[in-house]
């Protein structure tokens, strides 16, 4: 996450990264994201569990960033959900894979600038009808965090202090080229991603 992005006020409180996204990690991360290399999710998940252990120890649920159904159909898997399941297998909290949904298809964020990324995901997520995050500490899991726009929008929807909020959220980290998860704790003040 760039310095300018990290200095913005957020609806979430902390982030953890397992890998820095650079020329060395790019192949691994993009292999999971776009190359059907789902076998690396296990290693990333173990790294995420270890790196985010302080956050995960207080979490009730892992919520992977959802894909729109059309992208899920094309890709055949949600890489954030695979990471969340791997964290769970390493001793992490329960995974709520279908509790947050992507209401509309959004263009991929990769080539967008910070402001365009925020606009792109604004209003894209919603809490699945019949699900409640009330009283639960949630860690949002994503595969890559660049500006934090996607996690910010998920956190905004989940955070009870926002108009769109739906429950108490615990925070964790994110997985970028192998990062940890993120979350939001209603009892905690928003802060910088670390």
Regions found by a protein language model. Name each.
Residues 1-141, 147-194:
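Conserved PRPP/pyrophosphate-binding segment of the phosphoribosyltransferase/PRPP-pathway fold
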């Amino acid at each position: 996450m760039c310095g300018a992005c990290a200095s913005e006020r957020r609806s979430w409180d902390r982030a953890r990264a397992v890998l820095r996204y650079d020329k060395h990690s790019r192949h691994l991360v993009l292999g999971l994201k776009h190359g059907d290399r789902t076998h690396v999710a296990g290693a990333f998940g173990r790294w995420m569990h270890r790196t985010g252990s302080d956050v995960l120890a207080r979490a009730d649920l892992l919520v992977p960033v959802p894909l729109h159904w059309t992208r899920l159909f094309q890709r055949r898997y949600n890489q954030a959900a695979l990471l969340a399941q791997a964290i769970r297998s390493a001793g992490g909290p329960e995974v709520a894979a279908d509790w947050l949904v992507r209401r509309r298809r959004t263009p991929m964020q990769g080539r967008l600038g910070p402001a365009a990324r925020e606009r792109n995901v604004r209003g894209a997520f919603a809490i699945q009808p019949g699900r409640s995050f009330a009283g639960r500490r949630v860690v949002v899991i994503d595969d890559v965090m660049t500006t934090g726009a996607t996690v910010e929008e998920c956190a905004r929807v989940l955070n009870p202090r926002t108009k769109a909020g739906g429950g108490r959220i615990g925070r964790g980290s994110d997985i970028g080229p192998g990062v940890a998860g993120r979350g939001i704790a209603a009892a905690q003040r928003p802060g910088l991603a670390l």
